[in-house]
């Protein structure tokens, strides 16, 4: 089964949302230098239609004494911004995270954003779209996504951002919150990063031809969840004017659940109390300064050494970023309403991304005595479809339908929903993509971008580029 899983991942890379996409070589373009509060940045281009500005810092690196604190403003207007080799936030490497390497990759110095706009954008005032990547709030990077086609075809300025992930982005501990003041008392540092990126966008996007009074936030999976978090967060008031949540969910935990002392809540795994135990530290008495001095990869190693059979507490109803009543209830409360148009939806076959990896449902038959990858097939088509339909509808019921009903209760007037259906992928002798995956979790992203993802495999999956528009 171990071999089968690895092979299946390779065969289904087009549907693993957080896998890098190919881009043409970028070259500096004269006359595209833009001044920002973070420094001056020169645009680059792979074609004549759009300009990219890459790796712009929107906050100070959250490392050292700034680990597990609210993002701090970064100002260097006279500096020259250079594209970096990597801006990935620390995470576990692998196909799903779209990162290469062994064990863990990335740096705490990762709070950067990219901007892509039509070549003539700076002579106009165009709508702005800010993309929040998915990945369970534990993986992912802005670098995965190329919104060039969306920017050009729809004449919009697109911003893609990084934010802290996993235990670096979400933690609840008596010393961290107990010794802090103001926003530093939050448990939701990843979402504070997103808010900081939106604040930077408000102050600077007009220099790129964007309209700071016409900002749409959009995100998929955990990105959609974070869109909901922004809809209920008082800290995000006035930072956006429309919201799109793709395959979102509304799960939050209380601070007590996030700490989970002595595994008081056995249905939750990888709480902060467990993390400190894995680090061989006293979960109740270790100081915040001691925690901030630990090597970041040691923290990640301890975090991923913990079993994960249940939900991991991440987004926390801390009463600062997310109201203390929790996300789902806050969505229905008029006092948190942003009164903006909201579009939310899910995919017909959300859960095939995970069920297609489950040997209970899928065979991996050896080919040529194991010399070729296994041929994947569903064991029982009727049973497979039953569970796919049931669980995908459950995702929609809670993540979309209930959330939108709650927004209606809060007084939102312009609410829209969708369901994404697709089973027109190219067939492979090794796997029937339409029947095994169909409209899987994340399958819509290439259509939103307006171009195939995932390099050569994506070109195979989308033989006609226009099919992803």
Q: PLM features: residue spans?
A:
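Substrate-access "cap/lid" subdomains that shape
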Residues: 98-99, 196, 203, 229-232, ...
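Mobile gating loops/cap/lid regions near enzyme active sites that modulate substrate access
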Residues: 46, 106, 405-469
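C-terminal motif of bacterial Sec signal peptides marking the signal peptidase cleavage site
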Residues: 18-20
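Alpha/beta-hydrolase fold nucleophile elbow
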Residues: 209-220
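Non-catalytic accessory segments of hydrolases
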Residues: 2, 22-188, 458-469
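A short, hydrophobic beta-strand element of the alpha/beta-hydrolase
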Residues: 217, 244-246
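Alpha/beta-hydrolase active-site loop
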Residues: 110, 183-206, 265-270
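Glycine-rich nucleophile elbow surrounding the catalytic serine of serine-hydrolase chemistry
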Residues: 219-229
């Amino acid at each position: 089964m171990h071999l089968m899983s690895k092979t299946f991942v390779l065969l289904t890379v087009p549907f693993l949302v957080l896998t890098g996409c190919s881009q043409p070589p970028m070259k500096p373009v004269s006359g595209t230098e833009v001044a920002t509060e973070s420094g001056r940045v020169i645009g680059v281009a792979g074609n004549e239609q759009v300009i990219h500005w890459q790796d712009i810092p929107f906050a100070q690196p959250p490392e050292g004494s700034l680990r597990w604190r609210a993002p701090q403003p970064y100002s260097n207007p006279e500096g020259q911004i250079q594209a970096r080799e990597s801006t990935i936030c620390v995470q576990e490497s692998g196909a799903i995270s779209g990162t290469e390497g062994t064990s863990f990759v990335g740096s705490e110095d990762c709070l950067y954003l990219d901007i892509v706009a039509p070549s003539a954008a700076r002579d106009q005032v165009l709508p702005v779209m800010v993309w929040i990547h998915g990945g369970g709030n534990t993986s992912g990077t802005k670098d995965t996504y190329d919104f060039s086609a969306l920017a050009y075809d729809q004449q919009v300025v697109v911003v893609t951002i990084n934010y802290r992930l996993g235990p670096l982005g979400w933690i609840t501990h008596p010393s961290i919150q107990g010794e802090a003041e103001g926003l530093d008392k939050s448990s939701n540092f990843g979402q504070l990063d997103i808010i900081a990126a939106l604040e930077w966008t408000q102050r600077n996007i007009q220099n790129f031809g964007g309209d700071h009074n016409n900002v749409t936030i959009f995100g998929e999976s955990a990105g959609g969840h974070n869109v909901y978090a922004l809809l209920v967060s008082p800290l995000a008031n006035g930072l956006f004017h429309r919201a799109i949540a793709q395959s979102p969910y509304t799960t939050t935990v209380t601070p007590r659940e996030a700490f989970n002392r002595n595994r008081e809540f056995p249905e939750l795994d990888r709480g902060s109390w467990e993390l400190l135990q894995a680090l061989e530290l006293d979960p109740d008495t270790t100081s915040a300064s001691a925690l901030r001095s630990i090597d970041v990869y040691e923290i990640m190693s301890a975090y991923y050494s913990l079993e994960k059979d249940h939900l991991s507490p991440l987004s926390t109803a801390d009463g600062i970023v997310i109201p203390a009543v929790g996300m789902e209830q806050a969505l229905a409360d008029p006092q948190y309403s942003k009164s903006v148009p909201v579009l939310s939806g899910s995919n017909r076959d959300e859960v095939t991304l995970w069920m297609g990896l489950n040997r209970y449902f899928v065979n991996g038959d050896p080919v040529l005595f194991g010399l070729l990858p296994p041929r994947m097939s569903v064991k029982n088509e009727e049973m497979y479809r039953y569970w796919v339909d049931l669980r995908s509808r459950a995702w929609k019921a809670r993540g979309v339908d209930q959330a939108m009903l709650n927004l209606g209760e809060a007084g939102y007037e312009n609410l829209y929903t969708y369901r994404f259906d697709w089973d027109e992928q190219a067939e492979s002798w090794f796997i029937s993509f339409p029947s095994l995956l169909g409209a899987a979790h994340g399958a819509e992203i290439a259509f939103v971008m307006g171009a195939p993802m995932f390099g050569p495999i994506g070109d195979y999956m989308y033989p006609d580029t226009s099919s992803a528009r």
